[in-house]
Amino acid sequence: MTSPVENSTSTEKLTLAEKVWRDHVVSKGENGEPDLLYIDLQLLHEVTSPQAFDGLRMTGRKLRHPELHLATEDHNVPTEGIKTGSLLEINDQISRLQVSTLRDNCEEFGVRLHPMGDVRQGIVHTVGPQLGATQPGMTIVCGDSHTSXHGAFGSMAFGIGTSEVEHVMATQTLPLKPFKTMAIEVTGELQPGVSSKDLILAIIAKIGTGGGQGYVLEYRGEAIRKMSMDARMTMCNMSIEAGARAGMIAPDQTTFDYVEGREMAPKGADWDEAVAYWKTLPTDEGATFDKVVEIDGSALTPFITWGTNPGQGLPLGESVPSPEDFTNDNDKAAAEKALQYMDLVPGTPLRDIKIDTVFLGSCTNARIEDLQIAADILKGHKIADGMRMMVVPSSTWIKQEAEALGLDKIFTDAGAEWRTAGCSMCLGMNPDQLKPGERSASTSNRNFEGRQGPGGRTHLVSPAVAAATAIRGTLSSPADL
């Protein structure tokens, strides 16, 4: 838990992001120089940490605060055939070396690690929250773009490069210039069947993949306040897809209830002190944002992507756009390129697009609520002929929770594959990949060319749309069943 610094009693009206930043400035930059910001927690995985550990080793430096680092194995781990967590269960030699190196580095430098075979293992952005390591008011970094997910707790969380990972290891600080602030005001309430994934995809389509560049986004409004923590994590997770540095949601009782009692959460009097501080974090009435964007949540329907970046999205009820629908020359050219790669014909109803693989997984949408939503839709159904559906929980803990609820049986009875935890098909760095020309409906966060395997074509969807699509064989919502 981060304690407020002396100047936190200022009467200046501040946003949530500005308060967290203020309370972490070790030294303020002068004449345009960056501030030196204290980092409360650094999360590590097997892909972006080896070079940083090597840097410490080569310079003879120690890890300044091992207790403020937390590691797990996620990006390259297989999601089938894992029984003991042995390195021998990883067939790919490069992946095996990366996982082995992480284990060796964590042992040498005293970092807490949750490896394959550990019930607490999983995708790093699920592990932090489930352990209670992620808390309101923190600064959190990781060598991974989707660190922004932790902002759902009212923390300022963002991805960093490997050289910065090493800098945090050595100093527990980062030199940074303050980010601009943007309020995303969601008016109205989401309709039944519309999820936080639909909302964030609609936001990205509205402001564009560069619309949030240089900003911290704060998601606000009644629809946000009514969301569970799982849903809020989905929102903040995809802030980076709008170009933002981070995404945040003000902590409230929903946040406190989620964190309380978890292994690394404060206890007793420390808990009371923490909550008292956390309650001071929400944006002050009258605080000014650098930019405000409004979106009518009540008007939203299930939303998907049709192209090759997360901003190329439309309501599921619409049709594949034509490049001529775009007035901006860059958007027109991007649409032409995307349509060619995705092998789509303008005017085709999105609901007519045939899907080969449904992937229910990733740090965006593979928590227990996501699995429950999909299982409720799949119950009593079979997936379409020729369809492959992979269900990959985002942590072993969630996998066991789902199995205790019988969700695994619902998935397997429907014909889906029930896998072990990992990043899986979100990215083509492990055995779970699309074949060239295959098309997926994926609950992950990126639909770039080749993201899920060379030549693979990705449509980003919500868990509900994923489940309905698996049943019908074409992009579908539960209303189509």
UniProtKB/Swiss-Prot annotation:
Pathway: Amino-acid biosynthesis; L-leucine biosynthesis; L-leucine from 3-methyl-2-oxobutanoate: step 2/4. Its cofactor is [4Fe-4S] cluster. It catalyses: (2R,3S)-3-isopropylmalate = (2S)-2-isopropylmalate. Catalyzes the isomerization between 2-isopropylmalate and 3-isopropylmalate, via the formation of 2-isopropylmaleate. The gene is leuC. Keywords: 4Fe-4S, Amino-acid biosynthesis, Branched-chain amino acid biosynthesis, Iron, Iron-sulfur, Leucine biosynthesis, Lyase, Metal-binding. Belongs to the aconitase/IPM isomerase family. LeuC type 1 subfamily. This is 3-isopropylmalate dehydratase large subunit. CDD domains: IPMI. One of its GO terms (biological process) is L-leucine biosynthetic process. The keyword Transcription does not apply. PROSITE patterns: ACONITASE_1, ACONITASE_2. Its EC number is 4.2.1.33.
